[in-house]
Amino acid sequence: MADVTLDFQFTSSIEQVWKALTDSDMLAKWIWNNDFKPAVGEKFQFRSEPNEWWDGIVNGEVLKVEEPHILSYTWASAGETTMITWTLKTGADAATHLHFEQTGFSEETKATKGAIEGAKYSWTNFGEQLKKVLEQ
């Protein structure tokens, strides 16, 4: 079972949402600067401003690419490696439905008050930024 699950809905086409999830320049508009390439085995890095608790770096490796429906990669940051999976579907309403899962948090992290909630909060904010980017 996923530790964090979120569902988003966009009026943009599935191809537009896929591009926002896989194009480095688009990702930089709603997550952080990066060198992401959507190919299995590709290693990448997201870079944000560091703070007193975090170095601002997320390392990852692409695990699965099934354009335009499934994208999965590792998300390694602050000593923890989890797996991110995005699943895209076009609904009967012609909207693009985007399902997000983050799995693999350590038992220590799960036991830390607010850690999973913090991850959910961050990804919810990223989803709101993604919506703004898609509406431009």
Which residues are covered by each model-predicted region?
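A solvent-exposed, acidic/Ser-Thr-rich amphipathic alpha-helical stretch
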Residues: 33-44, 53-54
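Hydrophobic ligand-binding cavity/cleft-lining segments
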Residues: 1-35
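A conserved amphipathic terminal alpha-helix motif
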Residues: 103-136
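Hydrophobic pocket/interface hotspot
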Residues: 17, 27, 44-46, 62, ...
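A generic structural signal for beta-strand entry/edge sites
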Residues: 3, 43, 68-70, 93-97
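Generic structural detector for well-ordered beta-strands
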Residues: 7-11, 45-47, 61, 87
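Tryptophan-centric aromatic hotspots in well-structured domains and transmembrane helices
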Residues: 18-21, 30, 75, 86, ...
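Hydrophobic-ligand binding "helix-grip"
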Residues: 52-93, 103-106, 132
